[in-house]
Amino acid sequence: MLDITLLRDSPDEIVTMLHNRQQPEDEPKLRQLLEEDAERRKLVQESDELKSLRNRKSKEIAEIKKSGSGSADALILEMQSVGTAIAEMDSRLTALETSMEDILLALPNRLHPSVPVGRSAEENEVFGEPVSFTHPLDFSLKNHLELGKSLGILDFERGAKVSGAGFPVYVGKGARLERALINFMLDSHTEKHGYKEVFPPFMVNRESLRGTGQWPKFAGEVYHAPEDELYLIPTAEVPVTNLHRGELLETESLPISYAAYSACFRREAGSYGKETRGFLRVHQFNKVEMVKFTKPEDSYQALEDIRGHAEAILRALEIPYRVLLLCSGDISANAAKCYDIEVWSPAEEKYLEASSCSNFEDYQARRANIRFRRDGKSKPEFVHTLNGSGLATSRLMVSLMEHYQTPEGGILVPEVLKPYTGFSEITPSA
């Protein structure tokens, strides 16, 4: 959520941001918000003046009654009229504040100056040079789905029977390889980069979705259990960020860095064009998430750190990848700046998104009321929140399986995963 003071003082900047985000339809909402804000401020002043008058006159009425020096009936009638006016003003103020909050929750975050202006994903910028590793693939390649079926380690058909399309089943060494990836990533983030591991709930309440920005704008994309008013998480970002919702943190505790594994659930299984095969379009997938809470002045260095920590996983696995700096027309509504990390699929001959690393500045913290105090006398400030996928295993598994496949139809296990799997290869007879 944006600061109303920013909107009030710099409306033209916000209008430009909305157009750069390809959201010009939100400009009337901004105008409405500013009009309601002006009316609210005027009403607050008038209401305060009437309440002050009522207090003064109430004292006069009490003095008249105490002294018995005359009748207070006229003043009492006047104050009844004032009370009615105050009640009407307070009712209007409540309506204005509700409307303003709805608009504030719907408006997207401001953009960092380094975010390139562009209309769509086609205008995202490649950040740095793509990273490549040599894998001997001079034979007829199978895609991840063909490998999974032939090796008996993935079962999409039975997953569909149990739950519907988009719910994969990992079998045998495929399940072990998936678990190895998760444990390797968690160990890397906690042991090498200082993250504290948390294992969060996979269901959250509406206040948590509101705090991280999925509610109300993206409410239709999450699975909902209406009888309990709980929602399956689309990402561990939601429960982990909300661990500190409503808290006032001490400056000595910052930065706070968490790493969390969770299953992720999304009703809309991504927008991947016509590609719907295998892991490229799923409703449930596994992901290790990195979440940070920082002081405002430290957040952009923290973003680079998160990106580097995600890249370190791919380098250790020797998976080819590239980094994109998302343009204004493709970045999520909540983020001020975002990097996407894409892994290369040799069978599909294209890059696949496996990680997003974002700085939300104080956008989420303002919604979730997460603040810190620099010292005992200073005014509380909002922290900056960040997160990054470290990484999503579904797309990562696609690239891993395809790059490490053998001419015989097996899959070699990356060196760093062997201590976790207990085997070095998945063979056709596995």
Curated annotation (Swiss-Prot):
Localization annotation: Cytoplasm
UniProt-listed CDD domains: SerRS_core
Disulfides per UniProt: none
Protein name: Serine--tRNA ligase
Top EC category: ligase
GO cellular component: cytoplasm
Gene Ontology molecular function terms on file: ATP binding; serine-tRNA ligase activity
InterPro entries reported for this sequence: aa-tRNA-synt_IIb, aa-tRNA-synth_II, aa-tRNA-synth_II/BPL/LPL, Ser-tRNA-ligase_type_1, Ser-tRNA-synth_1_N, SerRS_1_N_sf, SerRS_core, tRNA-bd_arm
Organism superkingdom: Bacteria
Reactions catalysed: tRNA(Ser) + L-serine + ATP = L-seryl-tRNA(Ser) + AMP + diphosphate + H(+); tRNA(Sec) + L-serine + ATP = L-seryl-tRNA(Sec) + AMP + diphosphate + H(+)
Pfam families recorded: Seryl_tRNA_N (PF02403), tRNA-synt_2b (PF00587)
PROSITE patterns the record matches: AA_TRNA_LIGASE_II
Family: Belongs to the class-II aminoacyl-tRNA synthetase family. Type-1 seryl-tRNA synthetase subfamily.
Keywords for the protein's UniProt record, in alphabetical order: Aminoacyl-tRNA synthetase, ATP-binding, Cytoplasm, Ligase, Nucleotide-binding, Protein biosynthesis
